Amino acid sequence: MTSDFKVIIVGGSVAGLSLAHCLEKIGVSFVVLEKGNQIAPQLGASIGILPNGGRILDQLGIFHSIEDEIEPLESAMMRYPDGFSFKSQYPQALHTSFGYPVAFLERQRFLQILYDKLKSKDCVFTNKRVVSIASGQDKVTAKTSDGAKYLADIVIGADGVHSIVRSEIWRHLKENSQISVLEAPNASIKHDYSCIYGISLNVPQIILGIQLNCLDDGVSIHLFTGKQSKLFWFVIIKTPQASFAKVEIDNTHTARCICEGLRTKKVSDTLCFEDVWSRCTIFKMTPLEEGVFKHWNYGRLACIGDAIRKMAPNNGQGANMAIEDACSLANILQKKISHGSIRDQDINSMFQEFSMAQRARTESVCAQSEFLVRMHANQGIGRRLLGRYLIPFLYDAPAGLSGFSISGATRIEFIDLPTRSLRGAWGKSWRGSWEFILQSLVYLRPKFRIVYALYLVAAAAFILYCLSSLFP
């Protein structure tokens, strides 16, 4: 390592390992403290890598290993309660526009790749639960449950929604009267849905490269094909507030009861959820938190990933935004180091710069996620009408929504862009839906063009009205 600056990363999952890779590239010393006994445990979860995450991983020299593990998505089928369905080419549209496929693979395998590609494996420690963090005048110390102490210049919390680093940030803010003692850390977090996720094998009637979605009342089912006859799936279900404690305490029994009740749900014309559930090899249930935490840093402490935001998996951006966080923080750190050693007074400004760089984008992507999970579950008359009667006739509206969130993505500024990303629509306005509308008008018979155009204008106006809050 070429820098005297040292970073403690609390948490060895997507955000933590991504940051470790970025720090390795700029020569900054680090340690990763993971509380679990494995870096890549098998929890039955899958992970979606969209072009914004894929581009960063490609810059880090990792994406080719991920591509070897995936069955790229090409299209998606959306099915509604009345049996109506439509096909979206959003995965292929995103691949064509940004240069990277929509990739789904086992979360365990993804984490293993991140770890295997890391050169400084001796800096990654498991069974290291951080129990306290003490800030000194010029250093910070993290103490783990086994009594070990680690000294560094800053501590980055990549330790998820129940982050001890974020708890320490809130404690300091309250002690220094920067926030009210009555202000709750989770005040901005919603708990409206739960997620059951799992992996099934050898499910019949599955076509590789096609994502299947059942968008029912209060529940949505999503299926993604993988290699080796694996099918990754998750069920998002509206959950009463009083039931969340039960979900956390006895999630296996609760999940089993819910899935048993969904057996007859048709995911396609030829496939019922029974076909998926009966071939399930592993599953788990978890409450879904949604929202952006208000405070991200204090002193020498800062958070990234799920420690600063939580979103439903419907837009597939959770892991990708965590990767972007790591990239954004590394960009700022690299600039500081390139101008000489980092002074104590530079640390707070560095974290403030990170917050300014990521907060607006974070809030926008989270708003999109909140909108999607509710539209997929047909919650509210406006979302129900939008999903069932308008979006299907705009052809690639799903691609447009995804394209909006991808086009403004962060990239590693100190590493050249890969060739495949140079042809992409990065940083440009996403006009896929509107281009299709203009093209479709050309091929319609003249007497239908006016009717179709008026319908699309009305549909577009309604969509813009519904989505206006999502794209500030």
From Swiss-Prot:
UniProt-listed Enzyme Commission number(s): 1.-.-.-
SUPFAM superfamilies: FAD/NAD(P)-binding domain (SSF51905)
Cellular component terms per the entry's GO annotation: membrane
Presence of keyword Transmembrane helix: yes
Glycosylation (residues): 186
Pathway this chain belongs to: Secondary metabolite biosynthesis
Pfam families: FAD_binding_3
Key word Membrane present: yes
Signal peptide: none
EC primary class: oxidoreductase
Positions that bind FAD: 34, 48, 107, 306, 319
Swiss-Prot/TrEMBL cofactor(s): FAD
Transmembrane segments: 7-27, 450-470
Cellular location(s): Membrane
Membrane topology of this protein: Multi-pass membrane protein
One annotated GO molecular function: monooxygenase activity
Entry's induction text: Expression is down-regulated when the stress-activated mitogen-activated protein kinase (sakA) is deleted.
Function description: FAD-dependent monooxygenase; part of the gene cluster that mediates the biosynthesis of lolitrems, indole-diterpene mycotoxins that are potent tremorgens in mammals, and are synthesized by clavicipitaceous fungal endophytes in association with their grass hosts. The geranylgeranyl diphosphate (GGPP) synthase ltmG is proposed to catalyze the first step in lolitrem biosynthesis. LtmG catalyzes a series of iterative condensations of isopentenyl diphosphate (IPP) with dimethylallyl diphosphate (DMAPP), geranyl diphosphate (GPP), and farnesyl diphosphate (FPP), to form GGPP.
Similarity comment: family membership: Belongs to the paxM FAD-dependent monooxygenase family.
PANTHER family from the UniProt entry: FAD-BINDING DOMAIN-CONTAINING PROTEIN-RELATED (PTHR47356:SF2), FAD-DEPENDENT MONOOXYGENASE ASQG-RELATED (PTHR47356)
Name assigned to this protein: FAD-dependent monooxygenase ltmM
Source species: Epichloe festucae (strain Fl1)
